[in-house]
Amino acid sequence: MLRRAELMAYETIIVDIEDHVCVITLNRPEALNALSKELLDELVEALEEGQNNDKVRCIVITGSEKAFAAGADIKMMQDKNFSEVFLEDLFTNQADRISRIRKPIIAAVSGY
């Protein structure tokens, strides 16, 4: 088992690797794990870390406490108008990078 101290340090997710499974836990319970830019950036980094780790055969994504993920964190958009949010295209780069992961990814969803 790899201990958390041996893995990259993250602010909004927790990563554990045990028995060839990388478990990524979304860890913003105060916001019901809403997807902020920071969380998505860290999620992509952790997924790519799992992809590049020969000991990892599968990646599981789950949420902390009572929610898997409440959706996009609209607080990061509150000071922008529709055009700014639409043209900024906040999540396309992360979604594209996630789509390139070739190891199986399982969403362990419970709650909201």
Where are each of the predicted segments found?
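Short glycine/serine/threonine-biased micro-segments
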Residues: 32, 61, 65, 69-70, ...
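Glycine- (often His-adjacent) and acidic-residue-rich active-site loop
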Residues: 55, 63-97
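Glycine-rich beta-to-alpha active-site loop
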Residues: 97-112
